[in-house]
């Protein structure tokens, strides 16, 4: 046991002595810096860095490139507003003649318009130069106005008018008409009476009238004296011959 302890002490002393000797042997003064070495070889590429912030817009614009290929068609758009009507196209060629129609039903004369009137002078009022026939004898469908002396057309067509007026003096009368408020050509009839006897001045005509046209009798202011009494009557008449197609 004592031998082992002695051996351990000897080893410790030996190691202490060696460390002390080595420290004294390796210590030397500091040397000067050596010359720079040659550049080393490039290292391996590093890892990819993080994405940087967007840069500012460039000042210059690049040259315009070539036209690209057409893109794919997009979805159909919404219908637009209806446009204005276009101008009428040219008249086309006449079509072939159609087939003959079916024969219609027979007409009923009772359903046809039949305007007609007759009026005489009895106690007429004075209305300028218009000759008033105030007493109505016939006024089918009421075309004649006895307070104005005018016939007003309600059924377009061809009409016959006539008058017979009694006088003991020179007399000049006119059959006058208007259309759309505008006067038309008038027809004049005159009679000279030198003996102061009853004479009849008569006249008549056929007129084509439109709705609203008017017909009446006028007198010449200088030769318009008409007999008025119970011995003879003056009359004004008119009726539709046939309506316009």
Swiss-Prot record:
Modified residues (4-hydroxyproline): 39, 45, 54, 79, 85
Binding-site residues for Ca(2+), renumbered to this chain: 199
Compositionally biased intervals (Low complexity): 79-99
Residue span, C1q domain: 110-245
Segments of this protein annotated with the region Disordered: 28-114
UniProt modification remark: O-linked glycans are assumed to be the Glc-Gal disaccharides typically found as secondary modifications of hydroxylated lysines in collagen-like domains.
PROSITE patterns, per the entry: C1Q
Activity-regulation annotation: The C1Q subcomplex is inhibited by sulfated molecules, such as triterpenoid sulfates, heparan sulfate, or chondroitin sulfates.
Record PTM 5-hydroxylysine, positions in chain: 48, 67, 100
Key words of the record: Calcium, Collagen, Complement pathway, Disulfide bond, Glycoprotein, Hydroxylation, Immunity, Innate immunity, Metal-binding, Repeat, Secreted, Signal
Main localization, broad class: secreted
Residues bearing attached sugar chains per UniProt: 48, 67, 100, 146
SMART domains, alphabetized: C1Q
Any one Gene Ontology cellular component term annotated for this protein: glutamatergic synapse
Keyword Lyase in record: no
Domain remark text: The C1q domain is the ligand-recognition domain, which specifically recognizes and binds the Fc regions of IgG or IgM immunoglobulins. The collagen-like domain interacts with C1R and C1S proenzymes.
Functional description taken from the UniProt entry: Core component of the complement C1 complex, a multiprotein complex that initiates the classical pathway of the complement system, a cascade of proteins that leads to phagocytosis and breakdown of pathogens and signaling that strengthens the adaptive immune system.
Stated name of the protein: Complement C1q subcomponent subunit A
Source organism of the structure: Mus musculus (Mouse)
Gene: C1qa
